[in-house]
Design a protein with these regions (language model features):
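Conserved nucleotide-cofactor-binding alpha/beta core module
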Residues: 1-11
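Non-catalytic C-terminal accessory region of glycerolipid acyltransferases
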Residues: 10-156
Length: 156
């Protein structure tokens, strides 16, 4: 969804939206098949790594709400540390990022039951809310991850 926002040509945007829907549906089918086999699925809700100075990279993508609806529980996991540094020569190209040694802490929060989590958020919005409900749910996930990240960051 973040990449779609940058497409201004209506024809190209329509084409890219159709392509994006196909990818998302294939992903959803795959996630559902994994879930039915009892496999654990890890999803990065922002769709990318955070890039300092690019606050949009810290925002969760709304499609994560669809994954949440397919899943019984989720476990917020934060990864603190920076072993993949942005290239000074080409900061916009992640392929040029540098691998560096660093201390990394992987933290896990409490297991959260998806259905009640979503229902509570939507109930608090009220019936008259006309904004993007999916984005509100994902923003709450990102808020949980941010708090968790800050806690573990303080231990480093």
């Amino acid at each position: 969804s973040r990449s779609l926002a940058s497409i201004h040509d209506p024809a190209k945007r329509t084409e890219e939206e159709a392509r994006s829907r196909k990818i998302n549906m294939a992903s959803m089918r795959y996630v559902d098949a994994c879930r039915r086999r009892g496999q654990v699925i890890m999803v990065f809700p922002s769709g990318t790594r955070y890039r300092p100075g690019v606050p949009d990279t810290k925002r969760g993508v709304r499609e994560i709400d669809s994954y949440l609806r397919l899943t019984d529980v989720f476990l917020p996991i934060s990864i603190n540390g920076n072993c993949l540094r942005i290239s000074e020569d080409d900061p916009s190209n992640m392929l040029h990022d540098r691998v560096c040694q660093d201390k990394v802490i992987i933290g896990a929060g409490p297991v959260i039951e998806c259905k009640s989590f979503r229902n509570e958020i939507l109930k608090n919005l009220g019936d008259d809310y006309d904004g993007d409900k999916k984005q509100v749910v994902v923003d709450k996930i990102m808020e949980i991850l941010e708090k968790q990240h800050n806690y573990y960051e303080s231990l480093m």
